Amino acid sequence: SYQLNLADTRMKLKLPDGAIEMKLRVLGKHNVYNALAAAAASTAIGISKENIASGLELFGGVDGRLQQKKCQHGATMIDDSYNANPESVRAALSVLASTLGEKILILGDMGELGDNAVDFHECIGEEARLIGIDRLFALGKLSAYSVKKFGAGAQHFKNIEDLITEVESALAPNVTLLIKGSRFMQMDRIVRKFEMEASDI
């Protein structure tokens, strides 16, 4: 069994040598499945439940992959800026949707989607709206299709400077931002901007 929230993920594993509870430092239901797979493989080679739990609890994730950070004005940022494809965006959206307060998706284009690129971007815009994301700020030519499908509450930006200005004006203690986009979009520039500002908290 497991319980998800933005701060951590609590799990209870039932293994051949007994049950054990643990707290994961990584976000998302998909990471619960990753932990289950790691636990199964570890059990198969004879690692104790205590060592499995300890190892899983120590893993803090990978930079740019669903990392929770604080930014100015008390807002929360989920840094998933390292890369993006439709499935990873959906996984990140499910994490954002589970948060309280206003939910803002900051989306850069997804690359390497071939002839289906427009369709995939449209789907992400529609899915974000349907699962309860409040606002969408988008950067890149393809993400304009996400904005169109999202509808009211979505804005498309031609440059990162205008996007950052708009995001800064939206920050408040009840706001959670998800920053997501393919590597070539360099969405980590936005993360760095807000991390720098976070020192003023």
Which sequence ranges carry the predicted segments?
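ATP-dependent carboxylate-amine ligase
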Residues: A7, D17, E21-H30, L36-I201
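A generic structural motif
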Residues: K12-K14
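A short, compositionally biased
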Residues: Q3-R10
